[in-house]
Curated annotation (Swiss-Prot):
Keywords: Chaperone, Cytoplasm, Disulfide bond, Redox-active center, Zinc. This is 33 kDa chaperonin. It comes from Streptococcus sanguinis (strain SK36). Redox regulated molecular chaperone. Protects both thermally unfolding and oxidatively damaged proteins from irreversible aggregation. Plays an important role in the bacterial defense system toward oxidative stress. The keyword Amino-acid biosynthesis does not apply. GO terms for cellular component: cytoplasm. Belongs to the HSP33 family. Under oxidizing conditions two disulfide bonds are formed involving the reactive cysteines. Under reducing conditions zinc is bound to the reactive cysteines and the protein is inactive.
């Protein structure tokens, strides 16, 4: 079971979220059949969305779009406050060579572009905010977004580690944010600790990477665990939603599908579930337009 643990320093100056997103990213890889670089890039973006959604309340949905310039294309993920996240990469079969040490490159793979966040509070007026991709590594781009767009100094670490067969071995990350009222000396102390943290990949390889992340973030600083919440890859698509989408097509197009194709098939981009609509389904839509 994947989870996010929310914590706060005992003096109330900082909050930290740590995540185990291994099954989330593994499910995404299985559904989309992504190559190594695509898996890591999509996985990091899924984790980034989980972090942003964890900061929200109510029935809020967070859409993250990584709009890079490379052949990978766009990465689009959607997370909600119930712990669900879904996502896809435009070109999952694109890959680049690993480094000599076996590291999967993401920054050069994503390229330059924009980091777009759409916050939907369910009011019909979603809020859009965009910052440039500063590295394409996703974690650094999220930290820059939070600092620039939300005016909240933040440190972010997230990664996806693959095994020798390029299957997801472990995935997770952390967010540390300064809270109002933090003193300069406290900020400096935490900044130093974050700078001296082991690489996120090393921490994720620990037997208990959640505890390893918390220990690296807080050191000897006392902190409180506020909550532990389940997170998962879960798409909310259904046949009715795609039926409604078909209903928006011109009558002539529906008749062509009925007569020439004997039906229609729509595949959800987010989870690759295929929905089949037979001639009777199409006939129903055609009658509604008569």
């Amino acid at each position: 079971m994947d989870k996010i643990i929310k914590t706060i320093s005992e003096n109330g100056s900082f909050r930290a979220y740590v995540l185990d997103s291994t099954e989330t990213v593994r499910t995404a890889q299985e559904k989309h059949q992504t190559q190594a670089s695509s898996t890591v890039a999509l996985g990091r973006t899924l984790i980034a969305s989980q972090i942003l959604a964890a900061n929200e309340k109510g029935q809020t949905k967070i859409t993250v779009k990584v709009l890079g310039t490379s052949s990978l294309g766009a990465i689009i993920t959607v997370a909600d406050t119930e712990g669900n996240v879904k996502g896809y990469v435009q070109n999952p079969g694109v890959d680049i060579k690993k480094t000599a040490t076996g590291e999967v490159l993401v920054g050069p793979f994503v390229g330059q572009g924009e980091f777009l966040v759409i916050t939907d509070y369910g009011t019909g007026n979603p809020y859009n905010s965009m910052t440039p991709l500063i590295s394409g590594e996703i974690g650094e781009d999220l930290a820059f977004y939070l600092t620039e767009s939300q005016q909240t100094p933040s440190a972010v670490g997230l990664n996806v580690l693959l095994d020798e067969n390029d299957k997801v071995k472990v995935a997770g990350g952390f967010l540390v944010q300064v809270l109002p009222g933090a003193k300069e000396a406290e900020i400096a102390r935490f900044e130093k600790r974050i700078q001296e943290m082991p690489a996120i990949s090393r921490l994720l390889e620990s037997d208990d990477h959640i505890e390893a992340l918390l220990a690296a973030i807080y050191g000897n600083e006392p902190y409180k665990r506020l909550s532990e919440e389940e997170i998962r890859f879960q798409c909310d698509c259904n046949k009715e939603r795609f039926m409604n989408a078909l209903a928006t097509l011109p009558k002539a197009d529906l008749e062509e599908m009925r007569d020439q194709d004997q039906g229609a098939e729509i595949v959800c981009q987010f989870c690759q579930t295929a929905y089949h609509f037979d001639q009777n389904d199409l006939e129903e839509l055609i009658r509604d337009k008569s």
